[in-house]
Amino acid sequence: MPALKIPLFKMKDMILILCLLKMSSAVPAFPQQPGIPGMASLSLETMRQLGSLQGLNLLSQYSRFGFGKSFNSLWMNGLLPPHSSFPWMRPREHETQQPSLQPQQPGQKPFLQPTVVTSMQNAVQKGVPQPPIYQGHPPLQQAEGPMVEQQVAPSEKPPTTELPGMDFADLQDPPMFPIAHLISRGPMPQNKPSQLYPGIFYVTYGANQLGGRGDPLAYGAIFPGFGGMRPRLGGMPHNPDMGGDFTLEFDSPVAATKGPEKGEGGAQDSPVPEAHLADPESPALLSELAPGALEGLLANPEGNIPNLARGPAGRSRGFLRGVTPAAADPLMTPGLAEVYETYGADETTTLGLQEETTVDSTATPDTQHTLMPRNKAQQPQIKHDAWHFQEP
């Protein structure tokens, strides 16, 4: 019997030791510091890295106002109190930097008494009552004051003018509606770095497909006075007079090589009859009647064509496939037809437009490619750009 009892006692001791080891590993040896109830107990540096307003927040990826905003969705929904009600998110001048070496923030006065400010901030965060500081009064009044006033005064409302670095409105209890408190306070006076992307606005695919017609609708609400978003390599502003003056036609592949430039008379190209203007299949009329639906599909939205190679002055240098300008004008110079590329006849039929019209140099005013009166003023500019800027 004693031989059987000795292993049992050893087993009990071993079980007891194992239970103690298990309990010691489960219960933390160092008790955590008491924090705000309901919040996770993290270290001070970790919470400052997480919730600091000095840089980008880790929670800012859930923000509805973009990256790096100080108001993310948790604070906007009212799930958390305002930022500075947490003691670890308050400005920290007294730990790592001397107050004299700290950069002054705009709109704030320089520190009058740095040691007094530091001592009061330490006392306020610790919650220890402290005798008030009388900066405007002589020390005789402080000595004459009763002792009760020295214990009651700091708990009510410390003087706000002597402490520009602290926001004492936040030392009170957090309000019932933290979002209203945040909005009423305005932006935080932190030295927040400028964001990498000031604002990213997404425009729908349909507005981008319209070649520039849908841009005032899409961008105009965001940026007032926004003209057109047509691609301009030269940086020239969009000319509204050039909007609807050009009439681009589907030409035969020999249309750009014929005419007075090559020594042949233009009379052999018969002008387009006036009944062609009433044809609903005309590309110019289609772009006039339904500009929004066709400019994403047709190769020729009127005005500046979006996907063009632009010259240094910002104007068109070459047109798209199968489209040549109404180049047969008396103001045009010889050799302009070489600038524009010509393509095969199989690439000129778009959306079932089977008829092909030719450019006539002696165009009567009732033809399709009649130029508007204000377009005549723009023609020498296009001639000048195409003549001088022919580099690739």
From Swiss-Prot:
Q: Which GO terms describe its molecular function?
A: growth factor activity; structural constituent of tooth enamel
Q: Which GO biological-process labels does this protein carry?
A: biomineral tissue development; cell adhesion; odontogenesis of dentin-containing tooth
Q: Keyword ATP-binding, does the record have it? A: no
The record's section on InterPro entries has:
Amelin
Query: Where Phosphoserine occurs, residue numbers?
Result: 43
Q: Where in the cell is it found?
A: Secreted, Extracellular space, Extracellular matrix
Q: Which UniProt keywords apply?
A: Biomineralization, Extracellular matrix, Hydroxylation, Phosphoprotein, Secreted, Signal
List where Basic and acidic residues composition bias occurs: 382-392
Instruction: List cystine links.
Output: none
Q: Where is the composition biased (Low complexity)?
A: 97-109
Please list the residues that carry the modification Hydroxyproline.
37
- Polar residues bias (residue ranges): 359-381
Question: Has the keyword Nucleus been applied to this entry?
Answer: no
Q: Name one GO cellular component term.
A: extracellular region
Q: Name one Pfam family in it.
A: Amelin
Location of region: Disordered: 86-109, 247-280, 349-392
Signal peptide segment: 1-26
Q: Which PANTHER family match?
A: AMELOBLASTIN
Please give the family membership noted in the entry: Belongs to the ameloblastin family.
Q: What does this protein do?
A: Involved in the mineralization and structural organization of enamel.
Q: What is this protein called?
A: Ameloblastin
Source organism (scientific name): Bos taurus (Bovine)
